[in-house]
Amino acid sequence: MDLILTTFGTYLHRQGEMFVVKIKEQKQEVSSRKVRSIVITTGASLSTDAIELAVEKNIDIVFLDQVGHPYGRVWHGRPGSTTAIRREQLRLADTEKGLRLALGWLLRKFDNQVEFLREARQRRSRLSAALTEKINALLELRKSLEAVNGELEMVRGTIMGFEGRAGRTYWEAVNLLLPDHFQFEARSRNPAKDEFNCLLNYSYGVLYGTVERACILAGLDPYVGFVHTDHYQKKSLVFDLIECYRIWADETVVGLFAARKVKPDLFDRLQNGLTLNKEGKVVLMGQFSEYLDESIRYRNRNIKRRDTVQLDCHRMANEWIGRISDEDDSDAGVDTV
């Protein structure tokens, strides 16, 4: 399991083969055999004895900043599972198997988008014909993408071409779901040109942090991607994996407009666009956090929606090194204190 220390003033130390979590006068003992990683946020501390035990047991210690982004990590210097995982990640990146992995993530994104539009079509009969046209176009592009073969290096441009065409089709459909005065011309970033893109960009930023953290805890290298190439200081794998989860932000932001919670005073004007102000962040994150924390049924267990990212990353890493079967997710728990 992942031992996550979030309470201000938490102190972690060692007692034999046990980790002891102390919060004021309360203590909780956790067997080191059950811990896969220790995640520490601001305001918590740990002893050097606890660090030594973690190193002995090949347990990663990850430090997160105030917004949940990893900024540091402690692990042992001996070859272990993280080394094996990253070696396999590098090997897969330019193989046919790597291509199938990358296509799987994008196909999952397409499926999420189609399902979202189908559900929207059921609720908005006046848009049925227009949404059906977009859905059918996405399904045709999905077929083309699924048929791609070869090594990633040779077909990367083809994949990104299909992805670009699908993106334009999808956003044209999403635009139909918004009130007329909030509709947008195209996707825009840094800064957003309109309210929809402003909310969406901030939501995607939250997801980037979630996916990066999950990669690091699972022993994956966030900088070695498959579709997105590993340019210097570019978290390519994060850009690849986030495709599976973008729909969470899409659904949340469209839902805010549908509920008429989006007002002009949630945004501040810039010279060339918009930025989300403090009130806007409260409105967005209240809705988004509730959505991410919702308990869902996933891989035969009840789990928070946000924790499925961690489960997916651990599962993938373990499969790469032959550690688990398709049915075994028994070690993917999270304990937060």
Language-model features, listed with the residues they occupy:
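Short gly/pro/ser/thr-enriched loop/turn and capping motifs at secondary-structure boundaries
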Residues: 47, 67-73
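Short low-complexity, flexible loop/linker segments enriched in glycine and/or proline
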Residues: 76-80
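Short alpha-helical basic/polar micro-motif
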Residues: 36, 48, 52, 205
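Active-site helix-to-loop segments that bind/position phosphate- or nucleotide-bearing substrates
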Residues: 1-15, 21-24, 29, 71, ...
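Compact, well-ordered interaction domains used in eukaryotic information-processing assemblies
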Residues: 43-46, 51-53, 58
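Short hydrophobic alpha-helical runs that function as membrane-insertion/retention elements
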Residues: 38-41, 59-65
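Extracellular/luminal Protease-associated
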Residues: 32-46
